[in-house]
Regions:
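Transmembrane-helix motifs of polytopic, lipid-linked glycan transferases
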Residues: 21-24, 93-124, 166
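Signature aromatic-anchored transmembrane alpha helix within multi-pass, membrane-resident enzymes
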Residues: 16, 20, 235, 308-312, ...
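Short periplasmic/luminal acceptor-recognition loop of GT-C membrane glycosyltransferases, typified by
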Residues: 391, 405-443, 456
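Hydrophobic/aromatic-rich transmembrane helices and adjacent perimembrane loops
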Residues: 155-160, 203-204, 284-291, 315-321, ...
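Membrane-interface helix-loop-helix junctions at transmembrane boundaries of multi-pass membrane enzymes
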Residues: 178-181, 217-229, 295-323, 334
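Membrane-interface alpha helices of multi-pass inner-membrane proteins
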Residues: 182-199, 203, 207
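Membrane-interface micro-motifs in multi-pass membrane enzymes
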Residues: 116-172, 338-350, 415-416
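Short hydrophobic/aromatic helix or loop-helix immediately within or flanking a transmembrane segment
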Residues: 47-53, 63-86, 264-276
Length: 499
C-alpha cells in the first residue's frame, strides 16, 4: 500500500505538470495567433519539418546545414508527425512539447521534495515567469528582443535550452548528494548529444558549469573529488560530442568566418543597444526588460545570500543563472554577430532562481484553488484558438502548390520565398532554392534532391530582383502574396551551387 506521504508527493507532481500544460497551451495559443509566420512559415523554422518529411519518404539524404544539426528536434518532430495532425498541427503540438520540456528541466533544477521544501510550487512559479516573458514579447516582427518565444519553434535551439536546464538539474542532483554512478552517465549523455547537435551548448552550459565548479572549489563549497568528477564529465562529454561532429563534416557547410567576426564587436554592441532601445519603447517591452533584469538581480542576491549561509547547492544554481547570460552576451560581442537568439540564457536561466529558492511563505489553499481554476479555464479557452490558428487555411500557399503540382514542372525561388512552398509540396524537388543570380543556394536544404530544368520562378515581397533574368516573355500567375513567373518551355540556366 502506498504511503500517504508518497501519494501526496505524486499528487503534487501531477498538479505541477497539469499547471505547466495549462501554461504551455496558453503560451502556444498566443504564439500561434500572433507569430504564426515564425511558427509555421519562416524560412529557418521549417527545416526540421523538411528533414523529417524527407526521412519519412525515404529520400536520399545530403543536407547542407548550419553548425546546428537539429538531431533531437528532428527526432521529436518525426515522432509527433506519426499522429497524423498535418504539418501545422504537428508544429503546434511540438511547441507545446517544447514548453513542457522546459518545465521538466526547471523541475529537475528545483531538486527533490524534502520536508520544508516546495520544489513543485517553485517550478510552476518559474515556468509561469518564463511563459510571462513569452507573452510579453509580442508578435514576431515587432521591434525588440524576441527570445522566450523562440523556444516554441523547432529550429531556434529548443533542444539546447532543454539540454542546458537538464544539465544544470543533474549538476544540482550531484551537489545534493545523489549517487554519481547514476547521475554522471546521464549527464555525459546529455552533454555529448547537446554539443554534437549544437556547439553553442558549450558557451551556454559547459563553460558556466566549469566556472561555477571553480568558484565552489575556491570557496570550499564542494569537495575536490566531486569537482573533479563534474568537470571531467562535462568537459569530456563535450569533447566527445564535438569530435562526433566530424561524422557530419560534409553536411556542415557554414564557414567559420560567418560566425566569428571579432572585428565587428563594436557593431554588435551598437546593434544590441539598438534592439534594447526598440524593446523599451513599448509597455510590453519595458515590462519584459524589467522582469528579465529583476530575475537576474534576484539570482545575484540569492547567490550571495546562499553563499553566506553555506548553501552551496542553491548558490551554484544561482551562479550558473548569472554566468551563462553573461557568457552568451560576451559571445555575441566577441563574435561580432547580429544573432539575438544567442542571448536566450537571459530568459530561461534566471527564472530558475524561483525554483531553486522559492518564496518562504506558502500560498493559502483557497487562493491556490482559485488560481488553479482560473488557469484551467484559461487553458481550455486557449485550445479552440490554437486549433483555429493551426488549421487556418493559407489560400496563397495552396494556390502555389496546386499550380506546381498540376504543372509537373520544376521552378526556382529564393530562400525566404520557397521554404514554405517546398514544405507544402508533395515533391519538394519541384522547387529549387537559388540566390538572385540563379545559383542553387545550398543552405538548410537537401542537396540530394534532383534539380530538373527550371521553367518558372516564384517571387514575393522578400525576393531580391533576379540578375540577368529577362521576364518579358513570362506569364505572371497571381497567388496572393506570391507571384509565379511562368516561362513556358523556356529553360532558365542555373549556375554553380553555393552556400
Amino acid at each position: 500500500m502506498m504511503r500517504p506521504g508518497m501519494m501526496q508527493r505524486r499528487a503534487a507532481e501531477a498538479a505541477g505538470w497539469g499547471a505547466a500544460l495549462a501554461l504551455a497551451l496558453i503560451a502556444v495559443a498566443v504564439v500561434a495567433s500572433t507569430s504564426s509566420w515564425l511558427l509555421y512559415r519562416d524560412g529557418d523554422s521549417v527545416v526540421v519539418a523538411l528533414m523529417a518529411d524527407s526521412l519519412r519518404r525515404g529520400d536520399s539524404q545530403d543536407w547542407a546545414l548550419s553548425p546546428v544539426l537539429f538531431l533531437p528536434e528532428t527526432t521529436v518532430y518525426a515522432a509527433l508527425s506519426f499522429l497524423g495532425l498535418g504539418t501545422t498541427g504537428t508544429l503546434t503540438l511540438n511547441a507545446v512539447v517544447n514548453l513542457l520540456a522546459v518545465y521538466g528541466g526547471i523541475r529537475l533544477v528545483a531538486g527533490r521534495s524534502r520536508p520544508g521544501s516546495r520544489p513543485v510550487t517553485g517550478s510552476v512559479l518559474a515556468f509561469a515567469a518564463f511563459v510571462a516573458l513569452v507573452l510579453l514579447e509580442g508578435p514576431d516582427g515587432m521591434p525588440g528582443f524576441h527570445l522566450a518565444l523562440l523556444t516554441a519553434t523547432t529550429t531556434y535551439y529548443s533542444a539546447t535550452v532543454v539540454g542546458t536546464l537538464v544539465t544544470v538539474g543533474l549538476f544540482r542532483r550531484l551537489l545534493d548528494g545523489a549517487p554519481a554512478v547514476r547521475v554522471v552517465p546521464v549527464m555525459v549523455g546529455v552533454v555529448a548529444i547537446s554539443t554534437l547537435t549544437n556547439p553553442l551548448f558549450v558557451v551556454w552550459c559547459v563553460g558556466p558549469v566549469a566556472v561555477t565548479v571553480g568558484i565552489l572549489l575556491l570557496g570550499r563549497r564542494i569537495v575536490p573529488r566531486l569537482a573533479f568528477v563534474t568537470l571531467l564529465a562535462v568537459a569530456g562529454a563535450a569533447a566527445v560530442g564535438y569530435l562526433l561532429r566530424g561524422f557530419f563534416a560534409a553536411n556542415i557547410v557554414a564557414a567559420g568566418g560567418n560566425y566569428l567576426r571579432p572585428d565587428q564587436a563594436g557593431a554588435a554592441l551598437a546593434r544590441l543597444a539598438g534592439v534594447l532601445g526598440d524593446t523599451v519603447v513599448s509597455v510590453n517591452g519595458l515590462l519584459w526588460l524589467a522582469v528579465v533584469l529583476a530575475l537576474f538581480a534576484t539570482s545575484v542576491v540569492v547567490a550571495v545570500r546562499s553563499w553566506r549561509r553555506r548553501d552551496g547547492v542553491v548558490a551554484a544554481v544561482c551562479v550558473l543563472a548569472v554566468v551563462a547570460p553573461l557568457a552568451a552576451t560576451a559571445l555575441v560581442v566577441v563574435a561580432g554577430t547580429d544573432a539575438d537568439r544567442y542571448l536566450q540564457p537571459w530568459v530561461f536561466l534566471p527564472v530558475v532562481v524561483l525554483a531553486a529558492a522559492p518564496p518562504v511563505r506558502s500560498v493559502p489553499r483557497a487562493l491556490s484553488v482559485i488560481l488553479a481554476g482560473v488557469l484551467a479555464l484559461a487553458a481550455v479557452a486557449a485550445v479552440p484558438g490554437t486549433v483555429a490558428a493551426a488549421s487556418r487555411p493559407d489560400a496563397d500557399l495552396a494556390c502555389v502548390t496546386r499550380w506546381i503540382d498540376a504543372s509537373g514542372r520544376t521552378g526556382a525561388g529564393q530562400f525566404w520565398t520557397v521554404r514554405a512552398p517546398k514544405l507544402a509540396l508533395t515533391d519538394p524537388s519541384h522547387l529549387v532554392q537559388v540566390d538572385n543570380t540563379m545559383r542553387p543556394y545550398d543552405w538548410l536544404v537537401n542537396r540530394a534532391e534532383r534539380r530538373g530544368p527550371v521553367t518558372f520562378l516564384i517571387q514575393d515581397a522578400a525576393t531580391v530582383p533576379f540578375a540577368g533574368v529577362s521576364t518579358f516573355d513570362a506569364t505572371p500567375v497571381r497567388c496572393g502574396r506570391y507571384t509565379i513567373l511562368d516561362f513556358g518551355s523556356r529553360v532558365l540556366p542555373l549556375g554553380d551551387p553555393r552556400n
